[in-house]
């Protein structure tokens, strides 16, 4: 597992990081880390990234399962993908695809009544009101490639990363 401290629930950079996280290791088979570590190199059984935001801080992590002799190579490949996100801005097409995928996942999550209830409670606790899904979708549409790159540069510097190997 690799990860770093990240943004609080109220931080404006949280949503661009959420989109970036989804691109890197979200649930889709087209997530960058899945394509690199599993499909291209055949090194992992599973790979995913996750983020959690709290009132005062947050955390972001990458988890992968591999043979013990492949750990260092997998870590190098993860760092390579993070470096790509820091160094190369997304094309308009890549950004549009990522936004469309995330908005689709949100729409599907809204159909899950348990998830909807959890989201409702979380937003009520943090903001005292229900989250307006249309506002969220509009905010996702407003994310720029520059914001994604800025967040990647802020979050993924090698000196910020912590590792845990079991």
Where are these regions (language model features)?
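His/Glu-based metal-binding/catalytic segments typifying zinc-dependent metallopeptidases
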Residues: 1-31
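M16 family metallopeptidases and their MPP-like homologs
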Residues: 1-7, 34, 38-87, 92-143, ...
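Short, conserved catalytic/metal-binding micro-motifs enriched in Asp/Glu and His
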Residues: 18, 148, 163
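A short, acidic, amphipathic alpha-helical segment used as a generic capping/interface helix at domain edges
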Residues: 144-150
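Short proline/glycine-enriched turn/loop segments at secondary-structure junctions
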Residues: 151-155
